[in-house]
């Protein structure tokens, strides 16, 4: 695990979130990884990407067969292009024009990694000491071309058993580049980036904790055009609000993670509107699965000066029980986890216990 300067809690939390999201960061590649020279979120991403790229290159960059067309060679290889050989008058030089397939690491997926590293090298928000590691990583990509990060076709990337080790690294690169572009355009702040990262961690935690033989945990995508009062950066950085649904044979819990921003704190009616909106989605979910449905809004506080110690609160909205709780992005994960567990305990666990009691009474009769 990384060595850390105690005073930089933001970087510690961000690193721990990334470790939770990407198992590779907890592996041997990062055994000697240190955070003591990292002071910004951009530097953290740069340090992780460069270490990851270096480790990948040491194992051997992924190669594919690349078509080399109309190459002038001294000995025949692949398909000989007779017409082109005559046109170029290669006979006098003792050569032939050939087209052939060659196994090469100079391919698009490696171009993306090199392009990302080059971008980080010239990023003014990355610490100079971190750039030393970026330069070392770039040296591992000699002989590989690069692509302009503004022209990357992410959907063109195809994964198979041989290049699956790239998947999470490419995903991290895309997230980092998209967020930094949004920051430059004034759409996103570092605190909001932490919120986005935290939201991903919360979703993964619910899936890993409660997806078992008793419960099914799934992600429910709700397009933002169907949501009200969403922060502007949410609308511009993603297409949908990804709710978590925990469901068993008796009931279901629909969890919506939202940002606790200044607008929410100033407008006393906004929290109620969020709850009523969640009721609408609970009703749709009930119509689909025919089970009793509860809802819970998990607000994420990004204000370092405030700490939320209040327990979960629950209110009835149109015959639906809707909970509300607040977690702090800069708090220790242990305390965050306890609050998330309360969401499950109050709704799913309590409903299960109630059903068991009813069944026991019936069996005694």
Where are these regions (language model features)?
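Terminal, charged accessory segments of proteins
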Residues: 1-187, 341-365
